[in-house]
Structures are given as structure tokens and as C-alpha cells.
């Protein structure tokens, strides 16, 4: 597999980090999701949020400490490369000055409607488990 040059740009606080996450790493994330979906380890938002079918039809898989043996080997390089890009972004936008200690608690892989792809990460910032305002949103 060819190693493509990693490039980045930040404009109006929107960061683009090309080739930090490889196609192979994306495919591994999709494979983890699909395998866990087969074992009914994903969440259907229609059921757990009682959402109307026309509003939310996505499914989610949460990779965290409780199931690390399932996903770590497949997603380790994706997480490392993501962290490199995120640290660069936080440093160059001033985010690390405002929020010096970021901790990743879970990885959320979300499968959306057909043609809408997969949503790999978002970070919530706030206290407690309630719905807090989002600080950063990432799509891979």
C-alpha cells in the first residue's frame, strides 16, 4: 500500500487533514461496526431515542474500555493518526489554551442512511452524562 503525503489546512476553524487516516483504516472501522452489528452490539436510534423513522435512522457502535478487546487491534492506528491531527488542530487554533486536558473516553462509529457514509467521532465537552454542547465534531 502506498503512503500518501499527509497535508493539512485550517480556515475559519475548519481543519482539513488529508491522508492522516488511510482508506485501509476507514475500512477497518467499517468492518468493526459491521461485525458488531451482526452480534447486535450496535444501537438503533429509532428504538433507544424513540425517534420518528423519517428523522433518525442511523445506528451507532460505542468502542470504549468495556469492549477494548473487540476493537483495539483494528482501530489502534486510526486512533493514533487521529490524535496526531487533533493535537495539531488544537495547538494551531488555540483550543488547547482553552481546554488544556482533553481525554477521549469512547469512540463512536455511526452508520447513517445509505449514501451518507459513516460518522466516526465527535467529542462532547462538559460535566456529567447529559447532552452537553459539543466542542468539536470530526468526520472521517
List each language-model region with its residue ranges.
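Fe(II)/2-oxoglutarate oxygenase catalytic core
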Residues: 1-140
Amino acid at each position: 500500500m502506498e503512503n500518501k503525503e499527509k497535508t493539512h489546512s485550517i480556515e475559519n476553524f475548519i481543519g482539513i487533514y488529508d491522508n492522516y487516516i488511510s482508506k485501509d483504516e476507514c475500512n477497518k472501522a467499517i468492518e468493526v461496526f459491521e461485525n458488531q452489528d451482526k452480534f447486535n452490539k450496535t444501537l438503533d436510534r429509532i428504538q433507544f431515542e424513540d425517534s420518528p423513522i423519517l428523522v433518525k435512522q442511523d445506528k451507532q457502535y460505542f468502542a470504549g474500555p468495556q469492549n477494548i478487546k473487540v476493537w483495539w487491534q483494528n482501530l489502534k492506528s486510526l486512533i493514533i493518526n487521529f490524535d496526531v491531527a487533533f493535537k495539531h488542530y488544537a495547538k494551531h487554533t488555540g483550543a488547547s489554551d482553552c481546554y488544556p486536558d482533553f481525554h477521549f473516553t469512547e469512540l463512536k462509529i455511526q452508520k447513517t442512511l445509505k449514501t451518507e457514509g459513516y460518522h466516526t467521532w465527535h467529542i462532547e465537552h462538559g460535566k456529567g452524562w447529559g447532552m452537553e454542547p459539543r466542542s468539536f465534531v470530526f468526520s472521517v
